Structures are given as C-alpha cells and as structure tokens.
C-alpha cells in the first residue's frame, strides 16, 4: 500500500490498512493514504452510525451515542434477545463508546491524529463494528 506521507510511522500505519476492509469502508483508504487521518477515521465511524440508523429504522434526528443506546438498548431493534443481559449491555456500550470517542469529537471540533497508527486503528475498529452489524442485519432481517 503506497502512502503519500513519509516516515516509518506513516508507512507502518498504512500497512495496517492493507487488508480487505468492509466494502462500505474501502473509500476511507484513499483519505488515509493522502495523510488525511482525521477524515479517514471520522468517515469510517460515520459509516458505522449510518448503518446503525439504517438497520434500526431510526429517525435522522437521532444521532451519536443516543442512537447507539436506543438501537442496542433494552427493547432496541438491534439488541440481541439471545444474549446474556451483560453481553447485550457490552455490545451497546461498545458501539456507544466507539461513536462517542471517535465520531462525535471531530463532528464538533478539530481533532488531530498526530499518530497515524492510532487513526488506522480507529478505521480497523470501524471495520469490526461493520462486520458485527452485518451479523446483526442477518438476525433482524
């Protein structure tokens, strides 16, 4: 994977993303390779939020952490009734925490990823969340 950014950190971080990302996240690779780490991380997490909204049939006004808590919380369309209650809470908190930590801040202010590895790991976290959502989509279909 070729990056326009130089230095060992940028190259190593780009190599982390040299994997088959979820099809809805493939477009963030180009932003990352251009050194637009903040945009790549934000765009990846935004895709997670969009997918949760689609699967839960939530209104567009319900956003961020509130969307995650409603969608995966008790009685939420994406909550898995087969899971142990603690595991259901864990999934809800995983999604709420990821969105609250990595998607919300750049929505409201400038966030600087000085470490490209951190930004690549945000993209990989979004990839995992999208794969979990694929499994959820199959269950709620």
Question: Each PLM stretch: what is its role?
Answer:
Residues 1-98, 112-117, 135-141:
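Amphipathic alpha-helical interface elements
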Residues 107-108:
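Histidine-centered active-site/metal-ligand motif
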Residues 119-137:
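Structured adenosyl-cofactor binding patch, chiefly the S-adenosyl-L-methionine
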